[in-house]
Structures are given as C-alpha cells and as structure tokens.
Amino acid sequence: MSFEGKTITCKAAVAWGAKEPLSIEDIQVAPPKAHEVRVKVDWSAVCHTDAYTLSGVDPEGAFPIVLGHEGAGIVESIGEGVINVRPGDHVILLYTPECKECKFCRSGKTNLCSKIRETQGRGLMPDGTSRFSCRDKTLLHYMGCSSFSQYTVVADISLVAISHSAPLRSICLLGCGVTTGFGAVTHSAKVESGSTVAVVGCGCVGLAAMQGAVAAGASRIIAIDINADKEVYAKKFGATDFIDSSKVKDLVQYVIDVTDGGVDYAFDCTGNVTVMQQELQFCHKGWGKLCVIGVAAAGKTLDFRPFLVVTGRQVLGSAFGGVKGRSELPNFVDEYMQGHFKVDEYITNEEPLKNINKAFDHMHEGKCIRCVVDMNKP
C-alpha cells in the first residue's frame, strides 16, 4: 500500500514537557513538501543531547516535540525537486545538513551549513511549519531529524543515502556520536602520527575519539573518566593508559607528570567547563591543543588565564566531528562494511520503542555506551 501524498499515522515518542517521561503516541505525519523527504525510521540511538533538551536547560528546547537525531531508515516518499535520494533508498539522518551552496559550505573551512539553521533551531521545517501533529496539537521537529518517530520528514539536505547492505541498526550511530568523536580527531584537530592524546569522558563520543586517535597514528592515548568501569571499554577502543580521575588529587599535575610536560591534544567529551579548564592546563606549553566536543549547559562559560594561550596553547571546537555528512558519511559506511571501522562495538543495549524511557535510564546509569531503539517494535 502506498502512502505517497497522504498523511501517515504512526507511533512516536512525544516529549510533552521538560523533565517528563516520553509518551508513546499515535501521531500524524504529513507528506513531504518541495525539497523534503519522508523517511520510515527503522533504528534510532539515544544520545545525551536528547536528554539535555528533555531536561529543560537547552535554550533552544521547546515542547511538545519529537526528539531523536541519531537515526537511520528507508525513504518512503519525496517532495517536488528532490534529486539526491529516491523512495527505497537507505539513509542516515543528518542533524548537521549540507546544502553545498551556502557561504559556510562553499568556504571549505567548516562542515557547518547555514541554509536551514534558523528554522531548524525553532523546531520547524524550512518553510516555517511542522509535519507532525498529535491530538490536534502541532508537534515540533528536533535538530532537523526527529528520529523517535516511526516516520519523519526532513529537508533533502538533512540525510544521505548509503549502501543497502549496511545494517541500519548499526549505522544509525554514524548520525551523531561515532562520527562526532572520530572526526574531532581526524578532521577538526587533525592529530598527527606520534602524538600524545588525552580523551576525557569515555562515553560513545570519547571512545570514538580514541578510535580516531588510533587511526591518526597517535603513539599514546590516555583515557580519563570518573568511572573506573569505563577502562575496559577505553582499552578496547585503543587507549594505552586509563586514569580514574576520581582517585587523583591533582589531575592537571598528574597528567603533566606522566606525559613529560603535557599532552599534544586533549579532547573534552564531558561538557563540564571546570573539566575543560583542567584540560587546557595539561595541554603542553607551546603547542598543546584543547578540542571541545562536549556541549556545556546554557549560560556556562569557559574561564582561563590568557597566559595559557599566549604561551602557545590553543582552544578549538568541533561539531559533528567536522565531517560533511552528505559528502563523507558514505565513505565511513564503506569503511565499516570492509571491517576497517568499529561501529557495532558501541552498542551495549537495545530496547523497543515502547521502552524508550528505559533506554534513557540505561544511558544515565553509566554502564551503557549506546542504546539503540527498534522503531519497528512499537
């Protein structure tokens, strides 16, 4: 049965308000308009960014909304003017779009794209409206993806077609966490072979940064976390050292001592500005670089003595790992399919859509790296 041009009713996890459990609802998903694509979402992962918005501290957070931004599925139908995908294509949703036409895309200096940023930040499609409704109420879109719905509508620049042979259960992770961490090392910071690298925070993004450091040829990869249980994961993804920071009185001095002056690169995957300050201090004088990946809570600022940067240290940031989704993700998928790139290893838990709140519980318990949600099991 074809739903092309028709509204679809499906299951979705709706966030009606901040700090409230997600509610499984029957929602209506309108057909795609010009330059839009409707996707049947098969798998979605749960990310700390979803929890950040649900907590109510996200300045762009608004409700009611369909969260989720780490998803993969199959194109159901396309709107007028769509030429980059067609019905039946397997796709990864992209919260960082790539129009290839705006000032940012043409600069060659960033993976950020400005074309739909304003409306995406307001939870709307590029024309300023929503394709979701429930109980006669309009639902907002999330990060241009809304993967916690069995069907979603996205801009045609917010997804990329990938190999049909790639398992959607795994490659949905490339929509955020894995790409974000890996690319921060290889694309944003451009770590050189032989470097000493510190990764602070051993969740999915941090582990992916370690995988990136291995690929870059780093000679020493120091994983740092307050949870000693993360050591086994860190070593699995390439860490040569593990520091349980909860047991170290002066982390800055400790890292400086064990690295002969500090690290060449530090990657923050915590979003904690106090930790970021420590990381900058244990970057090596003269050339050490701090790459901030973790997103701090609204209103938080990073304070440091200018002397730290005057003497050669640098601070940079990374969004989606500096990776251009439409141009580069297909190659990531191919590398995974050839056995050269870890993805499956990040998945520690799986839940059906009806248990999505349990997926969030797994994430908060600290034992989960990534929990994937089977959207076909409502």
UniProtKB/Swiss-Prot annotation:
- The EC number on file is 1.1.1.284, 1.1.1.1, 1.1.1.-
Record's catalysed reaction(s) = a primary alcohol + NAD(+) = an aldehyde + NADH + H(+); a secondary alcohol + NAD(+) = a ketone + NADH + H(+); S-(hydroxymethyl)glutathione + NADP(+) = S-formylglutathione + NADPH + H(+); S-(hydroxymethyl)glutathione + NAD(+) = S-formylglutathione + NADH + H(+)
Binding locations of Zn(2+) 2:
C99, C102, C105, C113
Q: Where does Zn(2+) 1 bind?
A: C47, H69, E70, C176
List the PANTHER family hit by this protein, alphabetically: ALCOHOL DEHYDROGENASE (PTHR43880), ALCOHOL DEHYDROGENASE CLASS-3 (PTHR43880:SF12)
Q: How is the cofactor bound?
A: Binds 2 Zn(2+) ions per subunit.
* Protein name stated in the entry: Probable S-(hydroxymethyl)glutathione dehydrogenase 1
| Any Gene Ontology biological process | formaldehyde catabolic process
Keywords per UniProt: Metal-binding, NAD, Oxidoreductase, Zinc
Query: Does the UniProt entry include the keyword Protein biosynthesis?
Result: no
For this protein, the record's InterPro entries field holds: ADH-like_C, ADH-like_N, ADH_3, ADH_Zn_CS, GroES-like_sf, NAD(P)-bd_dom_sf, PKS_ER
The record's family statement is:
Belongs to the zinc-containing alcohol dehydrogenase family. Class-III subfamily.
Which residues are involved in binding NAD(+)?
H48, G201, C202, G203, C204, V205, G206, D225, I293, G294, V295, S318, A319, F320
What is this protein's function? Oxidizes long-chain alcohols and, in the presence of glutathione, is able to oxidize formaldehyde. Also acts as a S-nitroso-glutathione reductase by catalyzing the NADH-dependent reduction of S-nitrosoglutathione, thereby regulating protein S-nitrosylation.
Q: Give yes or no: UniProt keyword Zinc.
A: yes
| Matches recorded under NCBIfam families | adh_III_F_hyde
Coiled coil: which residue ranges?
none
Pfam assignment, any one: ADH_zinc_N
